[in-house]
């Protein structure tokens, strides 16, 4: 069975124009994948819109994602408890490297901290290195609403990374019905408040 960490690390390299077959996937990269994220700062990409007050509320709809191939999960520590977020490969054919995220109560699912830029492959969002300092590689977590054609996932929020730190979204952990979710605390990209009816595919 192919090591999923090698696959994901390879996709991350490919997303920034590096061929993993040429440079190899180093042990330090794989080790980084095994680390834990403990803070998240978001960025809203210009081609989509963010609904302030929205967040990931997919835990109650976990069955919706059950049929999607699991690639892995990240473990996020907010200082008080751990929230697990799992990434899934979509079935909507928007791009074979487009991944989505949903919260999970399955605590055995742990680390994959890589998120996606639309059709551009996977990129690092943040990890903890051995000295316990954040490593972001210039990428930031962003929230994008699902395209209208994604009726199966209507009302859910997609997570992405983006390289523009000027468009920031601050996330917080909230508890609803005994379950924890990530929620937008502050949206610093006010143009994102204007949610269009249709989201044109970038590029």
UniProtKB/Swiss-Prot annotation:
The keyword Signal applies. Disulfide bonds: none annotated. Optimum pH is 6.0-8.0. No activity below pH 3.0 or above pH 11.0. Monomer. N-acetyl-D-glucosamine-specific lectin. Specifically agglutinates rabbit erythrocytes. Divalent cations are required for ligand binding. Calcium is the most effective, but manganese or zinc can also be used to a lesser extent. This is Lectin. It comes from Ulva pertusa (Sea lettuce). The gene is UPL1.
